[in-house]
């Protein structure tokens, strides 16, 4: 009985930790339990004495602080990692949303499902159906990329006329003031037609002068610039990146010095600016330049510190000394992007966004707005491109035949095709969910990094898969190619707004560990403020949090989550339970990693990356489940849901295993392995059988396939190869049963080629009627158009004569 009572006590302790019962209530329960065991004669009643001696200091604050919290506080202050001003501003900026629940070990799934699904307003829907549809019709991506290296003038004029650059600008200034969800849908539709078109529209609606002015501009700046930006009268760009400082914005060498100078014939207080920027989208054609630089005030003309820090200013590009106009050439996707320079350019102090009072506040301004832009533009562009590619590749896989069968029926093709379909579904879910948060007023900095990384990364992988499937069709550039420019340009999205390697290895968990953790940020603030009282309360909440996640990790691992609560009892029930387990695992691993590695965790980037991977996969899986719920839990969509969640579970568990295999403290790693994997690993990647179901969805018209491609531009036209493939798929499917009937009548397995000749012969023999013959003829036209590629006169490929150096010309002439 003694052994059973000890086991029961251990179970009771575990239950108290599991359910996160408060320290005081837990102490009372333990005392009552021990007293009950004493009365029952199982334990000596004297056990209450040492137990009370142990519990009293924990529950009596003065004793607890002096005996426990104060020594821990002193040690914590010593090991707390140093934080630069830019790091602190990045962490302080923005808010925590759903990722906070995932990080804390006990997600509230009902809260997730209660977030309202965004809807387009009548005005937003009309814009998508009207101006966006027309802009897609006007865009000829081959002309844009190969012949003009720019949007045609009439398309530029159309975008300005219909205020495409003003989606984020408020109506009081003449803007459209669209929701984040509407912006995402616009960009997805545009990106399915032309990456350059989507980038050109997306950048002014992301982080730039318009966004910064609305949040921080003076009334005079807003009244002057915002109506002009809304009309397209001003073209903005924002220059942050320097040759010497790419992702490390805090190290920009560009400078500004506060001084007196001449401006329009008068002596005024201003700044003398010197900068050298590159990779700046819209810089070659910009009329107003947003500029980030480090401002100093050596003469203290502003009355404050000498070193003011990063500052943002708005400068007309007609200002003497401003250099723009030259272009970079990014991977044959020639959107307007280039360098800008200036040396000792004098501008008035009022050019600072927000006026002189905002001097030195530039980095805070940027990071507070960056999460919104990063969370919408890049994920939407990648997602829209993949959605269109998914439909087109699925159609092509059905239309293209080898060995007398559609290549889409071959298992070797099914594997990458399933990844494309699954990623399209997951990416759209992830890109949509973050817009929910933004529309609720959140600025989810960590989520924006997650969505930026995973949408662009999965987008690139999907494009590579599509290229493998389409083969020669994908390689040959021309009007009929729907893939090659996306393939060439995929690294652009990977690189910009925080290169993906940096985002994964430093930003996601680097910010998430502090921003999303329920106690760490407040503990750091308490340590910084030397507030031992606040630290004491946080410390014991933190200890309870760690204990809870340790117990939850072990128990949920032992039971594979079967005992945890879920919001539903259908086919997705087990997924919520698995995610409950992984959330507890992440919380435990995060706390142990921070405790064991301390400040060195910042330098252990691969450990940080794997912790970020776990958080990311939890978000992606929850986004899939949220999408499935929002769309009415259509059972036909379950193969995509299964694929998306199973892939996320597998990758999250793989990241945990890799982390433990490489954790520097092997003893701690061994103990964690027992707690997290008490019965070993369990999650498998999507099976071949599931891949078959998912790949099949893309190859025939159906409601699930339509939901994958929702909102994309699918009108068949000369310049829309995706729309033409959609039309061809319908034509070929209509011809299939007629072809099979002819084969049966003739007793032959005829190839699905030369359908026009087959139609003629079958009509003559009376095997089909005229309508059926017309279907076969149309299918053959569509089939050939789909599988053929473009060819050119040699002179067409050299759009401009090459200017050779004089010496080379002389040699050739000789």
Curated annotation (Swiss-Prot):
Disruption phenotype: Cells lacking this gene are unable to grow on octanoate, decanoate, dodecanoate, or oleate as the sole carbon and energy source, but grow well on acetate, while the wild-type strain can grow on acetate, dodecanoate, and oleate. Pathway: Lipid metabolism; fatty acid beta-oxidation. Belongs to the acyl-CoA dehydrogenase family. The keyword Flavoprotein applies. It catalyses: a medium-chain 2,3-saturated fatty acyl-CoA + oxidized [electron-transfer flavoprotein] + H(+) = a medium-chain (2E)-enoyl-CoA + reduced [electron-transfer flavoprotein]; a long-chain 2,3-saturated fatty acyl-CoA + oxidized [electron-transfer flavoprotein] + H(+) = a long-chain (2E)-enoyl-CoA + reduced [electron-transfer flavoprotein]. The gene is fadE. Gene3D superfamilies: Acyl-CoA dehydrogenase/oxidase, N-terminal domain (1.10.540.10), Butyryl-CoA Dehydrogenase, subunit A, domain 2 (2.40.110.10), Butyryl-CoA Dehydrogenase, subunit A, domain 3 (1.20.140.10). InterPro entries: Acyl-CoA_dehydrogenase, Acyl-CoA_Oxase/DH_mid-dom, Acyl-CoA_Oxase/DH_mid-dom_sf, AcylCo_DH-like_C, AcylCo_DH/oxidase_C, AcylCoA_DH/ox_N, AcylCoA_DH/ox_N_sf, AcylCoA_DH/oxidase_NM_dom_sf. GO terms for biological process: fatty acid beta-oxidation using acyl-CoA dehydrogenase; fatty acid catabolic process. One of its GO terms (molecular function) is medium-chain fatty acyl-CoA dehydrogenase activity. The keyword Endoplasmic reticulum does not apply. Keywords: FAD, Fatty acid metabolism, Flavoprotein, Lipid metabolism, Oxidoreductase. Induction: Transcription of fadE is negatively regulated by FadR. Induced in the presence of fatty acids, in a FadR-dependent manner. The active site is at residue 497. It comes from the Bacteria. One of its GO terms (cellular component) is cytoplasm. Catalyzes the dehydrogenation of acyl-coenzymes A (acyl-CoAs) to 2-enoyl-CoAs, the first step of the beta-oxidation cycle of fatty acid degradation. Is required for E.coli to utilize dodecanoate or oleate as the sole carbon and energy source for growth. This is Acyl-coenzyme A dehydrogenase. It comes from Escherichia coli (strain K12). Its EC number is 1.3.8.7, 1.3.8.8. Its cofactor is FAD. Pfam families: ACDH_C, Acyl-CoA_dh_1, Acyl-CoA_dh_M, Acyl-CoA_dh_N.
């Amino acid at each position: 009985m003694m052994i059973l009572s000890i086991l029961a006590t251990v179970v009771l302790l575990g239950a108290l930790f599991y359910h996160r019962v408060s320290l005081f209530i837990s102490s009372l329960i333990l005392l009552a339990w021990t007293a009950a065991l004493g009365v029952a004669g199982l334990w000596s009643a004297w056990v209450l004495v040492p137990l009370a001696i142990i519990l009293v200091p924990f529950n009596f604050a003065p004793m607890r602080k002096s005996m426990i919290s104060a020594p821990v506080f002193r040690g914590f202050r010593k090991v707390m990692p140093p934080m630069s001003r830019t790091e602190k501003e990045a962490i302080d900026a923005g808010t925590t949303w759903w990722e906070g629940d995932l990080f804390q070990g006990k997600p509230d799934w009902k809260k997730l499902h209660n977030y309202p699904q965004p809807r387009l307003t009548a005005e937003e829907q009309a814009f998508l159906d009207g101006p966006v549809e027309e802009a897609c019709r006007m865009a000829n991506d081959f002309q844009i990329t190969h012949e003009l290296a720019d949007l045609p003038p009439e398309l530029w004029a159309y975008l300005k006329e219909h205020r495409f650059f003003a989606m984020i600008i408020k109506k009081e200034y003449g803007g459209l003031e669209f929701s984040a969800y509407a912006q995402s849908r616009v960009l997805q539709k545009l990106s399915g037609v032309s990456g350059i078109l989507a980038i050109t529209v997306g950048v002014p609606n992301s982080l730039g002068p318009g966004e910064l002015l609305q949040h921080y501009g003076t009334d005079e700046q807003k009244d002057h610039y915002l109506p002009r930006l809304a009309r397209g009268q001003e073209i903005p760009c924002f220059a942050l990146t320097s040759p010497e400082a790419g992702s490390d914005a805090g190290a920009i060498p560009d400078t500004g010095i506060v001084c007196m100078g001449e401006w329009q014939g008068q002596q005024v207080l201003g700044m003398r600016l010197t900068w050298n920027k590159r990779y700046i989208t819209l810089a070659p054609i910009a009329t107003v330049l947003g500029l980030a630089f480090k401002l100093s005030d050596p003469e203290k003309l502003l009355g404050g510190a000498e070193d003011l820090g990063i500052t943002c200013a708005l400068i007309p590009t007609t200002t003497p000394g401003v250099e723009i106009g030259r272009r970079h050439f990014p991977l044959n996707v020639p959107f307007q992007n280039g360098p800008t320079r200036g040396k000792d350019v004098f501008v008035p102090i009022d050019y600072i966004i927000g006026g002189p009072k905002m001097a030195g506040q530039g980095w805070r301004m940027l990071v507070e707005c960056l999460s919104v832009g990063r969370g919408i533009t890049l994920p939407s562009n990648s997602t829209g491109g993949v959605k269109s590619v998914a439909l087109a590749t699925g159609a092509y896989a059905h239309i293209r035949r080898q060995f007398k069968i559609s290549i889409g029926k071959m298992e070797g093709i099914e594997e990458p095709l399933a990844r494309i379909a699954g990623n399209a579904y997951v990416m759209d879910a992830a890109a949509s969910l973050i817009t929910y948060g933004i529309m609720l007023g959140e600025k989810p900095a960590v989520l924006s990094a997650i969505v930026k990384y995973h949408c662009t990364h999965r987008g690139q992988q999907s494009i590579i898969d599509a290229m493998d499937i389409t083969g020669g069709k994908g390689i040959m550039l021309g009007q009929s190619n729907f893939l090659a420019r996306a393939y060439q340009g995929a690294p652009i999205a990977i690189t910009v707004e925080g290169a993906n390697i940096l985002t994964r290895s430093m930003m996601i968990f680097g910010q998430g560990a502090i921003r999303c953790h329920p106690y760490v940020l407040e503990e750091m603030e308490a340590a910084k403020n030397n507030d031992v009282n606040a630290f004491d309360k946080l410390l014991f909440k933190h200890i309870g949090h760690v204990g809870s996640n340790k117990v939850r990790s072990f128990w949920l691992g032992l039971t594979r989550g079967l005992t945890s609560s879920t919001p539903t009892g259908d086919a997705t029930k087990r997924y919520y339970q698995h995610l409950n387990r992984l959330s507890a695992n992440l919380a435990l691993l995060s706390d142990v990693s921070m405790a064991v590695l301390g400040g060195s965790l910042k330098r252990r980037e691969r450990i940080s990356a794997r912790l970020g991977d776990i958080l990311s996969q939890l978000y992606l899986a929850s986004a899939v489940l949220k999408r499935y719920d929002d769309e009415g839990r259509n059972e036909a969509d379950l193969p995509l849901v299964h694929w998306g969640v199973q892939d996320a579970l597998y990758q999250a568990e793989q990241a945990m295993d890799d982390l433990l295999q490489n954790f520097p403290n092997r003893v701690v790693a061994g103990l964690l392995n027992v707690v997290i994997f008490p019965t070993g690993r369990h999650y498998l990647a999507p099976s071949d059988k599931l891949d078959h179901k998912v790949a099949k969805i893309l190859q025939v018209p159906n409601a699930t396939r339509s939901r994958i491609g929702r909102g994309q531009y699918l009108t068949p036209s000369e310049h829309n190869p995706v729309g033409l493939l959609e039309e061809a798929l319908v034509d070929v499917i209509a011809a299939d049963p007629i072809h099979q009937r002819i084969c049966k009548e003739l007793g032959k397995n005829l190839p699905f080629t030369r359908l026009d000749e087959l139609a003629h012969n079958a009509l003559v023999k009376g095997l089909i009627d005229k309508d059926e013959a017309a279907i076969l003829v149309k299918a053959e036209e569509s089939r050939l158009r789909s599988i053929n590629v473009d060819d050119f006169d040699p002179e067409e490929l050299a759009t401009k004569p090459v200017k050779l150096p004089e010496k080379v010309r002389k040699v050739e002439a000789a």
